[in-house]
Each structure stands twice: as C-alpha cells, then as structure tokens.
C-alpha cells in the first residue's frame, strides 16, 4: 500500500518531512497519466508502489527521454522489462535467472552498498582519466606551439627529435602511472551524473579545454621568451 511504501522509504532516508503526495504515485494512477503528464511527474517522484512491469518500464523510458542515465535494481521476473530498458540493470545474486539475464550487472553479495562503492570507483577512475588528458594535451599543445613559432621566427626547431620522444614517451609514461594510481575519493559522489545520449557530456569539458589552452599558452610564452633570451646571450 502507499502507506507501507512511504514508511519503508522514510526508514531508508528517501522520504522526508518536506515530501508530499506529488512525490508518490501508484501503478494504476501512473498508467492513467498521458505521456506528457507522466513526463512532468517523473522528475518529482520518489516512490511508485503497486507498480506492474509495464509501469516500471515506462518510468525508465520517460526518464531516458529527458536525457537521464537510469539504473534499475531488481530480483524478480517482473523486473526484467525495466532492467533491460535501463542503461544499467543490476540484479541481485539471489534473484531469478530471468532478472539476471536481463541485467548488465549481478550483485553477488546482495548489498546495495556495493552499488554505491562501484559508482564511486567508476567516477574516480573517470576523473583520473580527465587529469591525465589535461596533462597530456597541455604538453602536446606547448610542444607543437613552440616548434611552430620557433620555425616561423627563424629560430629553427627548439626541440630535437630525441627531446620530443623523451617528452612523449618517458614523461607521459610516468605521469600516466602516477595519475592512474591516485586512490578513489568519496568527494566524487557530490558531482552531478554525466548526461548521455545526443547531448551527452564529452570527456573533455569546457573548463578542461580552457585549462589546457590557457596553461599551454602561458608556458609557450615563457619558453619562447627563454629561448629568445638565451639565443641573444649566446
């Protein structure tokens, strides 16, 4: 019943005193809504009780139509349509074989805390990849810029082939190892989920691109100035 579902949600921290009837709906009431009405309602929903398999599947599809990344957990045969429709379907280790086949991941220890920990590790790894890309692309921007500018102003190539190989092979290898070994942090759980679909987030964000080109331009100016000074003194 809605009262039972509300009490369970309150005990696990989903339902709060600020929530109202707009945050809960039953399966029959959800089915009676048009697609336009349901699309507006799903953003505020916290509880859906007495839901049929088609109701769960429709909820997933409506969220996906709004560029949401949807994960669904379930252990029964009636959860299979929603598990298959979601971007990530998670079945319980003790669940039915139908649920496991429809899901992408099976939680062997049947613990929801494992989902949170897996998300934390995945987000931390994604952030480490972004850190490496900032380092790698900044170096490449600077290296290309000083070689190009050096040739244009008649200095020749400031970097030899050996130096370029050193930068791209030796330095990058150690940097990749260092950045990849950074431990996961729970702070990543405060980040908003990345968008998917046609308007999804690219791994290089606008702030990262600004950081790469801003830092690259700064170091290019410093290195060209140093080369000009050394050439003049020499």
Model regions: which residues?
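Basic, alpha-helical nucleic-acid-binding regions used in initiation and control of genome expression
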Residues: 83
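Conserved cytosolic catalytic loops of P-type ATPases
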Residues: 79
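Membrane-embedded transport module
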Residues: 12-72, 86, 91-234
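Substrate-recognition element of Asp-dependent hydrolases with the DxDx(T/V) motif
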Residues: 1-7, 69-70
């Amino acid at each position: 019943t809605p009262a039972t579902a509300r009490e369970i949600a309150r005990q696990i921290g989903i339902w709060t005193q600020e929530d109202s009837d707009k945050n809960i709906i039953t399966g029959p009431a959800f089915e009676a809504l048009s697609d336009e009405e349901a699309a507006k309602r799903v953003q505020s929903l916290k509880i859906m009780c007495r839901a049929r398999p088609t109701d769960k599947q429709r909820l997933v599809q409506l969220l996906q139509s709004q560029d949401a990344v949807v994960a669904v957990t379930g252990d029964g045969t009636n959860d299979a349509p929603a598990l298959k429709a979601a971007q990530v379907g998670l079945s319980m280790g003790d669940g039915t074989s139908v649920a496991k086949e429809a899901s992408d991941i099976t939680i062997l220890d049947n613990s929801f805390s494992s989902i949170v920990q897996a998300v934390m590790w995945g987000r931390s790894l994604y952030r480490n990849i972004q850190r490496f890309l900032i380092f790698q692309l900044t170096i490449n921007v600077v290296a290309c810029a000083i070689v190009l500018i050096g040739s244009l102003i008649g200095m020749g190539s400031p970097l030899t082939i050996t130096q370029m190989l050193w930068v791209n092979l030796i330095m990058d290898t150690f940097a990749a190892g260092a950045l990849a070994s950074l431990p996961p942090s729970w702070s990543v759980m405060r980040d908003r989920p990345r968008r998917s679909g046609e308007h999804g987030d690219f791994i290089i964000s606008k702030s990262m691109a600004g950081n790469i080109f801003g830092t690259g331009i700064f170091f290019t100016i410093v290195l060209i100035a140093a080369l000009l000074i050394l050439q003049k003194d020499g």
